[in-house]
Protein backbone atom coordinates (compact mmCIF):
# COMPACT_ATOMS: atom_id res chain seq x y z
CA UNK A 1 0.00 0.00 0.00
CA UNK A 2 2.93 2.36 0.69
CA UNK A 3 4.19 1.73 -2.86
CA UNK A 4 0.72 2.49 -4.24
CA UNK A 5 0.63 5.72 -2.23
CA UNK A 6 4.10 6.75 -3.43
CA UNK A 7 3.25 6.04 -7.07
CA UNK A 8 -0.04 7.92 -6.84
CA UNK A 9 1.64 10.81 -5.09
CA UNK A 10 4.15 11.15 -7.93
CA UNK A 11 1.34 10.87 -10.48
CA UNK A 12 -0.81 13.51 -8.79
CA UNK A 13 2.14 15.85 -8.52
CA UNK A 14 2.96 15.46 -12.21
CA UNK A 15 -0.65 16.08 -13.17
CA UNK A 16 -0.82 19.21 -11.03
CA UNK A 17 2.29 20.57 -12.77
CA UNK A 18 0.69 19.77 -16.14
CA UNK A 19 -2.44 21.72 -15.18
CA UNK A 20 -4.74 18.69 -15.25
CA UNK A 21 -7.08 18.02 -12.35
CA UNK A 22 -5.93 14.82 -10.58
CA UNK A 23 -9.50 13.62 -10.13
CA UNK A 24 -10.16 13.87 -13.86
CA UNK A 25 -7.16 11.70 -14.69
CA UNK A 26 -8.16 9.15 -12.06
CA UNK A 27 -11.68 9.11 -13.47
CA UNK A 28 -10.38 8.38 -16.96
CA UNK A 29 -8.17 5.60 -15.65
CA UNK A 30 -10.59 3.83 -13.32
CA UNK A 31 -14.16 4.94 -14.08
CA UNK A 32 -14.64 6.02 -17.68
CA UNK A 33 -14.93 2.51 -19.14
CA UNK A 34 -18.20 1.98 -17.24
CA UNK A 35 -19.46 5.51 -16.54
CA UNK A 36 -18.66 7.06 -19.89
CA UNK A 37 -16.69 10.01 -21.19
CA UNK A 38 -17.69 13.24 -19.50
CA UNK A 39 -19.36 11.26 -16.68
CA UNK A 40 -22.48 10.93 -18.86
CA UNK A 41 -23.02 7.23 -18.11
CA UNK A 42 -22.51 3.96 -19.93
CA UNK A 43 -22.99 0.53 -18.43
CA UNK A 44 -22.79 2.44 -15.14
CA UNK A 45 -24.90 5.48 -14.23
CA UNK A 46 -24.23 9.16 -14.81
CA UNK A 47 -21.78 10.66 -12.29
CA UNK A 48 -22.64 14.36 -12.25
CA UNK A 49 -23.53 16.47 -9.19
CA UNK A 50 -27.28 16.36 -9.91
CA UNK A 51 -27.24 12.58 -10.20
CA UNK A 52 -25.33 12.30 -6.91
CA UNK A 53 -27.70 14.54 -4.97
CA UNK A 54 -28.87 11.69 -2.72
CA UNK A 55 -25.32 10.51 -2.04
CA UNK A 56 -23.14 12.48 0.34
CA UNK A 57 -19.44 12.85 -0.58
CA UNK A 58 -18.42 10.62 2.34
CA UNK A 59 -20.78 7.92 1.06
CA UNK A 60 -19.42 8.29 -2.47
CA UNK A 61 -15.91 7.84 -1.10
CA UNK A 62 -17.02 4.64 0.63
CA UNK A 63 -18.50 3.31 -2.63
CA UNK A 64 -15.32 4.15 -4.55
CA UNK A 65 -13.15 2.29 -2.07
CA UNK A 66 -15.42 -0.63 -1.18
CA UNK A 67 -17.99 -1.03 -3.95
CA UNK A 68 -21.77 -1.01 -3.93
CA UNK A 69 -24.28 -3.85 -3.41
CA UNK A 70 -26.57 -4.81 -6.30
CA UNK A 71 -24.26 -3.40 -8.92
CA UNK A 72 -21.17 -4.35 -10.89
CA UNK A 73 -19.30 -1.63 -8.95
CA UNK A 74 -16.22 -3.16 -7.34
CA UNK A 75 -14.14 -1.35 -4.73
CA UNK A 76 -10.80 0.29 -5.53
CA UNK A 77 -9.28 0.24 -2.05
CA UNK A 78 -6.39 -1.83 -3.38
CA UNK A 79 -5.61 0.71 -6.10
CA UNK A 80 -6.39 4.11 -4.57
CA UNK A 81 -5.05 5.65 -1.38
CA UNK A 82 -6.96 8.21 0.69
CA UNK A 83 -5.65 11.23 -1.21
CA UNK A 84 -6.57 9.72 -4.57
CA UNK A 85 -10.06 8.78 -3.34
CA UNK A 86 -10.58 12.33 -2.07
CA UNK A 87 -9.43 13.78 -5.40
CA UNK A 88 -11.81 11.53 -7.30
CA UNK A 89 -14.75 12.45 -5.05
CA UNK A 90 -14.02 16.15 -5.49
CA UNK A 91 -14.03 15.73 -9.26
CA UNK A 92 -17.33 13.84 -9.28
CA UNK A 93 -19.08 16.61 -7.33
CA UNK A 94 -17.66 19.32 -9.57
CA UNK A 95 -20.01 20.68 -12.23
CA UNK A 96 -18.83 20.04 -15.82
CA UNK A 97 -17.67 23.01 -17.91
CA UNK A 98 -20.84 22.72 -20.00
CA UNK A 99 -24.17 21.37 -18.78
CA UNK A 100 -25.07 18.22 -20.80
CA UNK A 101 -28.11 18.79 -23.00
CA UNK A 102 -30.30 16.50 -25.09
CA UNK A 103 -33.24 18.39 -26.51
CA UNK A 104 -36.36 17.44 -28.45
CA UNK A 105 -34.53 18.60 -31.56
CA UNK A 106 -31.62 16.26 -30.76
CA UNK A 107 -34.05 13.36 -30.31
CA UNK A 108 -35.76 14.03 -33.64
CA UNK A 109 -32.44 14.40 -35.46
CA UNK A 110 -31.21 11.03 -34.13
CA UNK A 111 -34.14 8.99 -35.47
CA UNK A 112 -33.38 6.48 -38.24
CA UNK A 113 -35.69 3.98 -39.98
CA UNK A 114 -33.64 1.37 -41.85
CA UNK A 115 -36.71 -0.83 -42.50
CA UNK A 116 -40.02 1.03 -42.01
CA UNK A 117 -42.73 -1.25 -40.67
CA UNK A 118 -45.10 -0.58 -43.58
CA UNK A 119 -42.54 -2.04 -46.02
CA UNK A 120 -42.22 -5.39 -44.21
CA UNK A 121 -44.37 -8.54 -44.58
CA UNK A 122 -46.82 -9.20 -41.75
CA UNK A 123 -46.03 -12.93 -41.41
CA UNK A 124 -43.03 -14.61 -39.77
CA UNK A 125 -40.25 -15.54 -42.19
CA UNK A 126 -39.28 -18.64 -40.16
CA UNK A 127 -40.85 -21.96 -39.14
CA UNK A 128 -41.23 -21.57 -35.39
CA UNK A 129 -43.91 -20.58 -32.90
CA UNK A 130 -43.62 -16.77 -32.74
CA UNK A 131 -45.09 -16.77 -29.23
CA UNK A 132 -42.49 -19.20 -27.91
CA UNK A 133 -39.45 -17.28 -29.10
CA UNK A 134 -36.82 -16.13 -26.63
CA UNK A 135 -35.03 -12.82 -26.98
CA UNK A 136 -31.59 -13.34 -25.41
CA UNK A 137 -29.41 -10.35 -24.50
CA UNK A 138 -25.70 -11.25 -24.69
CA UNK A 139 -23.97 -8.42 -22.85
CA UNK A 140 -20.47 -9.83 -23.28
CA UNK A 141 -20.20 -8.68 -26.90
CA UNK A 142 -23.38 -6.58 -27.19
CA UNK A 143 -25.49 -8.89 -29.33
CA UNK A 144 -29.04 -10.24 -29.23
CA UNK A 145 -29.95 -13.82 -30.14
CA UNK A 146 -33.47 -14.81 -31.21
CA UNK A 147 -34.03 -18.40 -30.05
CA UNK A 148 -36.65 -20.95 -31.10
CA UNK A 149 -38.19 -21.99 -27.77
CA UNK A 150 -39.29 -25.41 -29.04
CA UNK A 151 -36.07 -26.62 -30.68
CA UNK A 152 -33.72 -24.40 -28.65
CA UNK A 153 -31.93 -23.35 -31.82
CA UNK A 154 -30.91 -19.78 -32.71
CA UNK A 155 -32.93 -18.20 -35.51
CA UNK A 156 -30.95 -14.95 -35.72
CA UNK A 157 -28.18 -13.03 -33.98
CA UNK A 158 -27.55 -9.32 -34.45
CA UNK A 159 -25.41 -6.56 -32.87
CA UNK A 160 -27.17 -4.39 -30.32
CA UNK A 161 -26.47 -0.96 -28.93
CA UNK A 162 -23.93 -0.78 -26.11
CA UNK A 163 -25.07 -1.88 -22.64
CA UNK A 164 -28.70 -2.78 -23.21
CA UNK A 165 -30.98 -2.60 -20.23
CA UNK A 166 -31.86 -6.19 -19.38
CA UNK A 167 -35.62 -5.98 -19.90
CA UNK A 168 -36.82 -5.50 -23.49
CA UNK A 169 -40.55 -4.91 -23.95
CA UNK A 170 -42.95 -6.25 -26.60
CA UNK A 171 -45.90 -5.10 -28.68
CA UNK A 172 -49.23 -6.68 -27.61
CA UNK A 173 -49.15 -9.19 -30.50
CA UNK A 174 -45.53 -10.15 -29.83
CA UNK A 175 -44.27 -9.10 -33.25
CA UNK A 176 -42.19 -6.11 -32.16
CA UNK A 177 -39.58 -5.86 -29.44
CA UNK A 178 -38.22 -2.62 -27.98
CA UNK A 179 -34.74 -2.32 -26.45
CA UNK A 180 -33.24 0.53 -24.41
CA UNK A 181 -29.50 1.01 -23.95
CA UNK A 182 -27.97 2.71 -20.94
CA UNK A 183 -26.71 5.53 -23.18
CA UNK A 184 -30.20 6.40 -24.33
CA UNK A 185 -30.73 4.53 -27.60
CA UNK A 186 -34.10 2.88 -28.23
CA UNK A 187 -34.24 0.15 -30.88
CA UNK A 188 -37.41 -1.23 -32.49
CA UNK A 189 -36.90 -4.74 -33.90
CA UNK A 190 -39.36 -6.78 -35.99
CA UNK A 191 -39.27 -10.40 -34.80
CA UNK A 192 -41.29 -11.59 -37.82
CA UNK A 193 -38.78 -10.22 -40.35
CA UNK A 194 -35.67 -10.23 -38.12
CA UNK A 195 -34.86 -6.62 -38.95
CA UNK A 196 -34.30 -3.34 -37.13
CA UNK A 197 -37.27 -1.10 -37.95
CA UNK A 198 -36.17 2.13 -36.28
CA UNK A 199 -33.82 3.66 -33.72
CA UNK A 200 -33.78 6.92 -31.81
CA UNK A 201 -31.66 8.35 -29.00
CA UNK A 202 -34.17 9.37 -26.34
CA UNK A 203 -31.65 10.57 -23.75
CA UNK A 204 -28.05 10.51 -22.58
CA UNK A 205 -28.50 8.07 -19.70
CA UNK A 206 -31.65 5.92 -19.72
CA UNK A 207 -33.19 3.73 -17.04
CA UNK A 208 -35.78 1.71 -18.95
CA UNK A 209 -38.83 1.85 -21.18
CA UNK A 210 -42.41 0.59 -21.21
CA UNK A 211 -44.92 -0.11 -24.00
CA UNK A 212 -48.62 0.66 -23.62
CA UNK A 213 -50.97 -2.32 -23.60
CA UNK A 214 -52.72 -0.97 -26.72
CA UNK A 215 -49.39 -0.93 -28.59
CA UNK A 216 -49.54 2.80 -29.41
CA UNK A 217 -46.94 4.35 -27.13
CA UNK A 218 -43.42 3.83 -25.83
CA UNK A 219 -42.45 5.74 -22.68
CA UNK A 220 -38.74 6.11 -21.88
CA UNK A 221 -37.48 7.07 -18.42
CA UNK A 222 -34.18 8.96 -18.23
CA UNK A 223 -31.60 9.76 -15.59
CA UNK A 224 -30.04 12.38 -17.88
CA UNK A 225 -31.79 14.59 -18.74
CA UNK A 226 -34.26 13.87 -15.95
CA UNK A 227 -37.39 13.36 -18.03
CA UNK A 228 -39.85 11.06 -19.73
CA UNK A 229 -39.81 10.75 -23.50
CA UNK A 230 -43.01 9.64 -25.23
CA UNK A 231 -42.52 7.93 -28.60
CA UNK A 232 -44.84 6.61 -31.29
CA UNK A 233 -44.53 2.81 -31.01
CA UNK A 234 -44.74 2.30 -34.80
CA UNK A 235 -41.60 4.23 -35.77
CA UNK A 236 -40.13 5.75 -32.55
CA UNK A 237 -40.92 9.28 -33.69
CA UNK A 238 -40.98 11.79 -30.84
CA UNK A 239 -44.40 12.70 -29.47
CA UNK A 240 -43.51 14.70 -26.36
CA UNK A 241 -40.82 15.32 -23.75
CA UNK A 242 -42.17 15.45 -20.19
CA UNK A 243 -39.78 16.99 -17.61
CA UNK A 244 -39.55 15.00 -14.37
CA UNK A 245 -40.23 17.41 -11.52
CA UNK A 246 -42.52 17.46 -8.52
CA UNK A 247 -45.42 19.86 -7.97
CA UNK A 248 -42.99 22.43 -6.52
CA UNK A 249 -40.70 22.23 -9.55
CA UNK A 250 -37.93 20.17 -7.92
CA UNK A 251 -36.22 18.24 -10.72
CA UNK A 252 -35.70 14.49 -10.52
CA UNK A 253 -34.25 11.53 -12.31
CA UNK A 254 -36.60 8.72 -13.31
CA UNK A 255 -36.12 5.45 -11.41
CA UNK A 256 -38.42 3.18 -13.40
CA UNK A 257 -41.30 3.10 -15.88
CA UNK A 258 -43.80 0.23 -16.11
CA UNK A 259 -47.12 -0.46 -17.81
CA UNK A 260 -50.23 -1.28 -15.76
CA UNK A 261 -52.34 -3.05 -18.42
CA UNK A 262 -55.72 -3.28 -16.61
CA UNK A 263 -55.42 0.41 -15.75
CA UNK A 264 -54.36 1.40 -19.29
CA UNK A 265 -51.65 3.59 -17.83
CA UNK A 266 -47.94 4.00 -17.26
CA UNK A 267 -46.64 4.15 -13.68
CA UNK A 268 -43.43 6.06 -13.03
CA UNK A 269 -41.15 6.14 -9.98
CA UNK A 270 -39.11 9.32 -9.47
CA UNK A 271 -35.72 8.98 -7.85
CA UNK A 272 -35.16 12.38 -6.22
CA UNK A 273 -38.62 13.55 -5.11
CA UNK A 274 -41.38 12.04 -3.00
CA UNK A 275 -43.83 11.51 -5.84
CA UNK A 276 -45.17 8.57 -7.84
CA UNK A 277 -46.77 9.30 -11.21
CA UNK A 278 -49.53 7.56 -13.14
CA UNK A 279 -50.06 8.56 -16.79
CA UNK A 280 -53.33 7.20 -18.26
CA UNK A 281 -53.51 6.68 -22.03
CA UNK A 282 -56.98 5.18 -22.65
CA UNK A 283 -58.38 8.53 -23.83
CA UNK A 284 -55.36 10.11 -25.48
CA UNK A 285 -51.66 10.81 -25.13
CA UNK A 286 -50.24 9.99 -21.67
CA UNK A 287 -48.72 13.40 -20.98
CA UNK A 288 -50.56 14.67 -17.87
CA UNK A 289 -49.37 12.76 -14.80
CA UNK A 290 -51.53 12.05 -11.80
CA UNK A 291 -49.21 12.83 -8.87
CA UNK A 292 -49.25 10.56 -5.82
CA UNK A 293 -47.33 11.55 -2.70
CA UNK A 294 -45.07 8.86 -1.22
CA UNK A 295 -43.31 8.74 2.13
CA UNK A 296 -39.89 7.86 0.73
CA UNK A 297 -38.00 7.92 -2.52
CA UNK A 298 -38.97 4.99 -4.74
CA UNK A 299 -36.08 3.24 -6.43
CA UNK A 300 -37.86 -0.02 -7.12
CA UNK A 301 -41.44 -1.26 -7.22
CA UNK A 302 -43.81 -4.04 -8.19
CA UNK A 303 -47.58 -4.38 -8.61
CA UNK A 304 -50.15 -6.60 -6.95
CA UNK A 305 -51.66 -9.17 -9.37
CA UNK A 306 -54.72 -6.97 -9.99
CA UNK A 307 -52.61 -3.81 -10.39
CA UNK A 308 -54.63 -2.09 -7.69
CA UNK A 309 -51.65 -1.72 -5.36
CA UNK A 310 -48.00 -0.83 -5.77
CA UNK A 311 -45.31 -2.09 -3.43
CA UNK A 312 -42.29 0.21 -3.48
CA UNK A 313 -38.96 0.56 -1.71
CA UNK A 314 -35.90 2.78 -1.50
CA UNK A 315 -32.22 1.93 -1.71
CA UNK A 316 -31.99 3.35 1.81
CA UNK A 317 -33.38 0.02 3.08
CA UNK A 318 -36.24 1.48 5.11
CA UNK A 319 -38.70 -1.28 4.28
CA UNK A 320 -41.54 -1.19 1.79
CA UNK A 321 -44.64 0.95 1.42
CA UNK A 322 -47.91 -0.11 -0.22
CA UNK A 323 -49.77 2.50 -2.28
CA UNK A 324 -53.39 2.12 -3.41
CA UNK A 325 -53.19 3.55 -6.92
CA UNK A 326 -56.78 4.82 -7.24
CA UNK A 327 -56.70 6.96 -4.10
CA UNK A 328 -52.96 7.39 -3.66
CA UNK A 329 -53.35 6.29 -0.04
CA UNK A 330 -50.54 4.55 1.77
CA UNK A 331 -52.29 1.43 3.05
CA UNK A 332 -49.40 -0.42 4.67
CA UNK A 333 -45.77 -0.27 5.65
CA UNK A 334 -43.89 -3.56 5.41
CA UNK A 335 -40.79 -4.25 7.52
CA UNK A 336 -38.41 -5.53 4.86
CA UNK A 337 -34.79 -5.82 5.97
CA UNK A 338 -31.77 -5.21 3.78
CA UNK A 339 -32.35 -4.09 0.21
CA UNK A 340 -35.25 -6.00 -1.39
CA UNK A 341 -35.26 -6.11 -5.20
CA UNK A 342 -38.99 -5.71 -5.70
CA UNK A 343 -38.78 -5.35 -9.48
CA UNK A 344 -37.59 -8.96 -9.65
CA UNK A 345 -40.21 -10.21 -7.22
CA UNK A 346 -42.96 -12.63 -8.25
CA UNK A 347 -46.34 -13.71 -6.92
CA UNK A 348 -48.27 -16.97 -6.74
CA UNK A 349 -51.16 -18.54 -4.85
CA UNK A 350 -50.46 -20.45 -1.65
CA UNK A 351 -53.37 -22.02 0.26
CA UNK A 352 -55.73 -19.94 -1.87
CA UNK A 353 -54.05 -16.62 -1.02
CA UNK A 354 -51.76 -14.52 -3.17
CA UNK A 355 -48.22 -14.18 -1.85
CA UNK A 356 -45.34 -12.08 -3.12
CA UNK A 357 -41.68 -13.06 -2.84
CA UNK A 358 -38.69 -10.83 -3.43
CA UNK A 359 -34.94 -11.45 -3.52
CA UNK A 360 -32.63 -9.21 -1.53
CA UNK A 361 -29.51 -7.61 -2.94
CA UNK A 362 -27.79 -6.92 0.37
CA UNK A 363 -28.79 -9.96 2.47
CA UNK A 364 -29.10 -13.68 1.86
CA UNK A 365 -32.87 -13.85 2.30
CA UNK A 366 -36.07 -14.18 0.28
CA UNK A 367 -38.92 -12.19 1.84
CA UNK A 368 -42.41 -13.68 1.39
CA UNK A 369 -45.43 -11.41 1.97
CA UNK A 370 -49.14 -12.19 2.27
CA UNK A 371 -50.85 -9.86 -0.20
CA UNK A 372 -54.20 -9.93 1.62
CA UNK A 373 -52.93 -8.37 4.83
CA UNK A 374 -49.46 -7.15 3.71
CA UNK A 375 -47.81 -9.08 6.53
CA UNK A 376 -44.46 -10.86 6.16
CA UNK A 377 -44.97 -14.63 6.07
CA UNK A 378 -41.38 -15.77 6.14
CA UNK A 379 -37.77 -14.87 5.47
CA UNK A 380 -36.17 -17.79 3.65
CA UNK A 381 -32.45 -17.84 4.41
CA UNK A 382 -30.28 -18.39 1.31
CA UNK A 383 -26.56 -18.74 0.69
CA UNK A 384 -26.12 -15.08 -0.23
CA UNK A 385 -27.75 -11.97 -1.70
CA UNK A 386 -29.61 -12.55 -4.94
CA UNK A 387 -30.90 -10.56 -7.87
CA UNK A 388 -33.47 -12.51 -9.89
CA UNK A 389 -36.50 -14.66 -9.16
CA UNK A 390 -38.74 -16.51 -11.62
CA UNK A 391 -41.45 -19.15 -11.75
CA UNK A 392 -44.35 -20.34 -13.90
CA UNK A 393 -47.98 -21.08 -13.08
CA UNK A 394 -47.30 -24.78 -13.76
CA UNK A 395 -44.08 -24.97 -11.74
CA UNK A 396 -44.05 -26.00 -8.07
CA UNK A 397 -40.86 -23.99 -7.56
CA UNK A 398 -39.68 -20.41 -7.44
CA UNK A 399 -36.20 -20.28 -8.98
CA UNK A 400 -33.74 -17.76 -7.58
CA UNK A 401 -30.01 -17.10 -7.45
CA UNK A 402 -27.31 -16.08 -5.00
CA UNK A 403 -25.88 -13.81 -7.67
CA UNK A 404 -24.18 -11.40 -5.29
CA UNK A 405 -22.95 -13.93 -2.74
CA UNK A 406 -19.93 -16.18 -2.43
CA UNK A 407 -21.92 -19.12 -3.82
CA UNK A 408 -22.82 -17.20 -6.96
CA UNK A 409 -22.82 -20.36 -9.07
CA UNK A 410 -25.97 -21.69 -7.37
CA UNK A 411 -29.61 -21.63 -8.40
CA UNK A 412 -32.07 -22.32 -5.58
CA UNK A 413 -35.49 -23.88 -6.12
CA UNK A 414 -37.97 -22.90 -3.41
CA UNK A 415 -41.11 -24.98 -2.90
CA UNK A 416 -43.95 -22.49 -3.38
CA UNK A 417 -46.18 -24.18 -0.79
CA UNK A 418 -43.76 -25.14 2.00
CA UNK A 419 -41.51 -22.09 1.43
CA UNK A 420 -38.45 -24.29 1.92
CA UNK A 421 -35.44 -24.70 -0.36
CA UNK A 422 -36.15 -27.94 -2.21
CA UNK A 423 -33.23 -28.17 -4.67
CA UNK A 424 -29.91 -26.58 -5.56
CA UNK A 425 -28.50 -26.49 -9.10
CA UNK A 426 -24.94 -25.62 -10.13
CA UNK A 427 -24.94 -25.38 -13.94
CA UNK A 428 -21.25 -24.34 -14.19
CA UNK A 429 -19.34 -24.62 -10.91
CA UNK A 430 -17.36 -21.46 -10.22
CA UNK A 431 -19.23 -19.32 -12.75
CA UNK A 432 -22.06 -16.91 -11.93
CA UNK A 433 -25.53 -18.36 -12.56
CA UNK A 434 -28.67 -16.27 -12.73
CA UNK A 435 -31.83 -15.16 -14.51
CA UNK A 436 -34.26 -17.96 -15.28
CA UNK A 437 -37.04 -17.81 -17.87
CA UNK A 438 -39.58 -20.52 -18.70
CA UNK A 439 -40.93 -21.66 -22.03
CA UNK A 440 -44.47 -20.55 -22.68
CA UNK A 441 -45.91 -23.90 -21.52
CA UNK A 442 -43.65 -24.06 -18.45
CA UNK A 443 -42.05 -27.34 -19.51
CA UNK A 444 -38.50 -26.03 -19.64
CA UNK A 445 -36.50 -23.48 -17.69
CA UNK A 446 -33.62 -21.62 -19.32
CA UNK A 447 -30.94 -20.09 -17.13
CA UNK A 448 -27.82 -18.05 -17.80
CA UNK A 449 -24.19 -18.67 -17.00
CA UNK A 450 -22.97 -15.07 -16.77
CA UNK A 451 -19.53 -15.36 -18.28
CA UNK A 452 -17.90 -14.38 -21.56
CA UNK A 453 -17.35 -18.09 -21.96
CA UNK A 454 -20.90 -18.61 -20.74
CA UNK A 455 -23.97 -20.54 -21.78
CA UNK A 456 -27.71 -20.74 -21.90
CA UNK A 457 -28.62 -23.93 -20.03
CA UNK A 458 -31.98 -25.61 -20.65
CA UNK A 459 -33.49 -27.71 -17.85
CA UNK A 460 -36.56 -29.91 -17.79
CA UNK A 461 -38.57 -27.86 -15.29
CA UNK A 462 -40.01 -30.98 -13.59
CA UNK A 463 -37.25 -33.61 -13.65
CA UNK A 464 -34.55 -30.89 -13.32
CA UNK A 465 -32.39 -32.74 -15.83
CA UNK A 466 -30.21 -30.67 -18.16
CA UNK A 467 -31.62 -30.90 -21.69
CA UNK A 468 -29.31 -28.68 -23.72
CA UNK A 469 -26.49 -26.16 -23.37
CA UNK A 470 -25.89 -23.38 -25.88
CA UNK A 471 -22.58 -21.47 -25.69
CA UNK A 472 -23.19 -17.73 -25.38
CA UNK A 473 -21.27 -14.57 -24.50
CA UNK A 474 -22.52 -13.51 -21.07
CA UNK A 475 -26.27 -14.01 -21.66
CA UNK A 476 -27.49 -11.51 -19.09
CA UNK A 477 -31.18 -12.13 -19.72
CA UNK A 478 -33.65 -14.02 -21.85
CA UNK A 479 -37.31 -13.20 -22.41
CA UNK A 480 -40.10 -15.43 -23.68
CA UNK A 481 -42.50 -13.59 -25.99
CA UNK A 482 -45.68 -15.40 -24.90
CA UNK A 483 -44.95 -15.03 -21.19
CA UNK A 484 -44.16 -11.35 -21.57
CA UNK A 485 -47.15 -10.27 -23.64
CA UNK A 486 -49.45 -12.32 -21.40
CA UNK A 487 -47.95 -10.80 -18.23
CA UNK A 488 -47.63 -14.38 -17.04
CA UNK A 489 -47.52 -15.30 -13.38
CA UNK A 490 -43.92 -15.83 -12.31
CA UNK A 491 -42.20 -13.53 -14.78
CA UNK A 492 -41.12 -9.91 -14.52
CA UNK A 493 -43.42 -7.28 -15.97
Curated annotation (Swiss-Prot):
UniProt keyword Heme present: yes
Catalytic class of the enzyme: oxidoreductase
GO MF terms, alphabetically ordered: electron transfer activity; heme binding; metal ion binding; oxidoreductase activity
Statement: the UniProt record of this protein carries the keyword Signal: yes
Biological process per Gene Ontology, one example term: heme biosynthetic process
Changes seen on gene knockout: The mutant exhibits decreased dissimilatory nitrite reductase (NIR) activity. In the absence of this gene, the formation of the acrylic double bond of heme d1 does not take place and dihydro-heme d1 is inserted into the nitrite reductase NirS.
Binding site for heme d1: 165, 167, 169, 182, 207-208, 341, 390, 435
Alphabetical keyword list: Heme, Iron, Metal-binding, Oxidoreductase, Periplasm, Signal
Residues annotated as signal peptide: 1-18
Reported function: Involved in heme d1 biosynthesis. Catalyzes the introduction of a double bond into the propionate side chain of pyrrole ring D of dihydro-heme d1, therefore converting dihydro-heme d1 to heme d1.
Domain notes: Consists of an N-terminal domain that binds the heme c cofactor, followed by a long linker segment, and a C-terminal region that exhibits an eight-bladed heme d1-binding beta-propeller domain.
Descriptive protein name: Dihydro-heme d1 dehydrogenase
Classification of source organism: Bacteria, Pseudomonadati, Pseudomonadota, Gammaproteobacteria, Pseudomonadales
Originating gene: nirN
Amino acid sequence: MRLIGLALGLLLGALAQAGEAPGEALYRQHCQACHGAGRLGGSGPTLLPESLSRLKPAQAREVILHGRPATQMAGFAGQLDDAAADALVAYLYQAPPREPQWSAEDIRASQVQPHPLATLPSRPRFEADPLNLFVVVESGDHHVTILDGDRFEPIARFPSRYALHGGPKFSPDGRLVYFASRDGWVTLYDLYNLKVVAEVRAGLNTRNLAVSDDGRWVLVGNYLPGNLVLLDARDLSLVQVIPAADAQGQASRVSAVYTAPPRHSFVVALKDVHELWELPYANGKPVAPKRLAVADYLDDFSFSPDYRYLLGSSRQARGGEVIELDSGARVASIPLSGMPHLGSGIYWKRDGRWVFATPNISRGVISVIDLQNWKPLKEIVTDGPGFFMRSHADSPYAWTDTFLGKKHDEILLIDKQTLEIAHRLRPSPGKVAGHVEFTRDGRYALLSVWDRDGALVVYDAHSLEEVKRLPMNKPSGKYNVGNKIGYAEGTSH
